[in-house]
Amino acid sequence: MDGCIDWSVDLKTYMALAGEPVRVKCALFYSYIRTNYSMAQSTGLRLMWYRNKGDLEEPIIFSEVRMSKEEDAIWFHSAEAQDSGFYTCVLRNSTYCMKVSMSLTVAENESGLCYNSRIRYLEKSEVTKRKEISCPDMDDFKKADQEPDVVWYKECKPKMWRSIIIQKGNALLIQEVQEEDGGNYTCELKYEGKLVRRTTELKVTD
């Protein structure tokens, strides 16, 4: 696309487990320009999406069944490993053109686990410190009028938390971290009949 201002690849990476829904948002509206999708549309700008295939950018045909375009985002209703890659959004009219790419990684669960190590989040804490583990990147799955009903697991198993570990909204608060608190924490949310999971590895140091 000649004459297009190219912001290359945005720093935010999207991650999902196979079978989960995921929304890839056009980063232009969040980090690069001072306008939103509705305002851009009203001034005659068009938003187009492309999938990066090597050096080529192929226009995306939205099937609506598995993938649809919704305002400034692509909704993958049920992401698959083959969806991993780079997606470019282009905002343009006859005199203006700007684009940026977003990275999506979709991975299968590892055998016998509820997560894939490649798409874990990482948190660190020292022993005896207070630590809050959030359930990241869940904003797209929240209903405006209610707190999401999040369930937490450790090493993929339900756990009776000791008294100083408290679930606070969609986060888990460890009021005094112990060495045994290190490990993998998975938060789970039901959305339109599907499960959405995020796993955070907590590393505890002395």
Q: Where do the model's predicted regions map?
A:
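Extracellular/luminal immunoglobulin-like beta-sandwich modules
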Residues: A40, F86-E110, A144-P148, N184-D206
